[in-house]
Amino acid sequence: MTLRETVNNAHSHWMDADGPESEIIISSRVRVARNLAGIPFPHLLNKENSEKVIHAVRLAISNKEASELLGGLELSSLGELSPLERQILVDKHLISPDLLNDFQRKAVVLREDEVVSIMVNEEDHLRIQCILPGLQLKEAWDVVNRVDDGLEKTLDYAFSEKVGYLTSCPTNVGTGMRASVMIHLPGLKLAKQLAGVLNAINKLGLTVRGLYGEGTEALGDLFQISNQITLGQSEEEIINNLISIARQILAQEQAARRNLYKDRREVIEDRVFRAFGALKYARILSSEEAMRLFSDLRLGVEMKIISGIPVRLLNELMVKIRPAFITKMAGRELTPYQRDIFRAGLIRREFANLPV
């Protein structure tokens, strides 16, 4: 898939819902931060050095000796994309919102299957990312590690024998790794246990963020849980620790769902079928309301209360209902009210042929 096809298509591999534990853990992501030796960190980069970094990355991904490790990678300057297309890459979790700032000096590298993306000149010179469906942190790390090794055949990284990889933010020094899972926790929220679980997570040295990272809301009861510390731990230790905690949260969410269904079956079923009815027939829907309804419906699908609704479709719709993709589909700028009408119509059309 070319970059142009990527921004015209809401689907991405992590949405396939075919990974382990994907009924609750939507996706796993591993990202490493790397900087080039002898070049100032991005917050000090001038235009000349920004272009130097982009040129170095372009050469690295073209290195035929590293082709088996890298796979097919394509680099594009963010300046080549429209504001809508840049935002769609954010909505698909392929780049961060921060990459959009001062975008003329930045670039993105994508693998054809969208499993791998590399942000160039974000907070660090390179941020190499792999995102996979379900709980697949080890597999995502294997992919990132191979790409990192391939790039290092050409690039000279800023590295200290004493502390490890050097990064713009001190919290990333060491392995430079951030591992995270996107997890759906409506059961804990309905059982009023969510705050306690999130507080416990923070005490374990992990951080909890919203759907699109730091400073964003947990739309649709979706949370990103990631490690905070990279110094003094190996990559394997970071991965194994997060897997262990993710499984504990998974078990708590499953228990909350079982208890809710046992004690408040009619209430849960009512939420699920009300959500389905609203999504199938509503004429006006804001993105926030749609995400809330998707959460209730997703809960019903995962608990086998309702059938015939692919989770993959719900994952895709999380991107399709965002303002950027709606504007792109409409082919013109819309007012917020017009977007809400368009969004409701889009969802009705998607639901019209479901065997429900």
From Swiss-Prot:
Residues 24-256 form the Phosphagen kinase C-terminal domain. HAMAP family: Prot_Arg_kinase (MF_00602). CDD domains: bacterial_phosphagen_kinase (cd07930). This is Protein-arginine kinase. It is an enzyme of class 2 (transferase). It comes from Pelotomaculum thermopropionicum (strain DSM 13744 / JCM 10971 / SI). Catalyzes the specific phosphorylation of arginine residues in proteins. Pfam families: ATP-gua_Ptrans. It catalyses: L-arginyl-[protein] + ATP = N(omega)-phospho-L-arginyl-[protein] + ADP + H(+). GO terms for molecular function: ATP binding; creatine kinase activity; protein kinase activity. Belongs to the ATP:guanido phosphotransferase family. GO terms for biological process: phosphocreatine biosynthetic process. ATP binds at residues 27-31, 93, 127, 178-182, 209-214. Keywords: Allosteric enzyme, ATP-binding, Kinase, Nucleotide-binding, Transferase. Its EC number is 2.7.14.1. PANTHER family: ARGININE KINASE 1-RELATED, ARGININE OR CREATINE KINASE.
